[in-house]
Amino acid sequence: MFIKIGIQTAIQKNIDEIYLTHFTEENDYLVTLIEDYGFEKIADKKNGEYIFVKRLFPKKDKTYLPGEISKKFYPCFYDSREVSKFIVPIRPGYHSKLFTDYKRQTKLSEFMEEFIVEGNTIKKAYLCHSKTKGLKEGDILLFYRSNDVRELTSLGVVEKVYENVTEPNQIVSYVGKRSVYSRKEIEEMVNKPTKVILFKWHLHFENPLKYKNLLNYQILKGPPQAIIKISHDKYLKIKGEVKINDRYTFN
């Protein structure tokens, strides 16, 4: 969570890199964690303290795989034609738990109090019974909040997908602390083969795209009931309408 708030602060201040220092230990979980968000060790002090730096933007003279962009240079992501784009419907109750900071700025003090931890992290999990195939690492997820506001609200990037899971313990082991679903909800879901999507949340849209506009732009033909794959051209229309900052996209 502190990584999330640090990155958000860097974006607001227009800073290109952030750093932290840490006294490392053997099998240090924190080092593994920060490396998964693109922190790299650049120096160590005589007292055993290491210095780690995270750069928010990739070097222009290097080539990276789509998943590498999201991992090493989060919140940047790769959005060329090579990656698929999907609209993902989510009911309001789960949307509020999965994206607790939607349309609000989380305060540092909240991290010290009782809070929906899973919903306030970068790494998240989405469970569904959608039969849509082909989701892979690096693909883009466009979350559509159904029923109440009916609009595209947020963007994530796929890390891993598990298909046709029928054991609750398997799901628990896959999602770890990412899940906003209770054990009971998971047990009910696996009555049918369940898709588990692990993803990184990247941003909420400055200008959420309403359902009526999705119809007008022929992006949707009706209310989405399951995950829908869309064309790159439709994604570009969405990208312009919701005002995704090109500074954080690479293609």
What is each of the regions a protein language model found here?
Residues 81-83, 136-138, 151:
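Short gly/pro-enriched beta-turn/loop segments at secondary-structure junctions
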Residues 151-162:
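Short beta-strand-centered aromatic/proline hotspots
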Residues 131-145:
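Short coil-to-beta transition motif at edge beta-strands of beta-rich domains
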Residues 9, 15-16, 20-21, 28-106, ...:
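Contiguous surface segments at macromolecular interaction interfaces
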Residues 122-131:
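Short alpha-helix capping/helix-loop boundary micro-motifs
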Residues 24, 145-149, 203:
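Short, flexible beta-strand-to-coil junctions
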Residues 2-7:
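Conserved acetyl-CoA pyrophosphate-binding loop and the N-cap/start of the following alpha-helix
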Residues 13, 149-151:
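A cross-taxa feature marking solvent-exposed loop/turn segments within ectodomains of secreted
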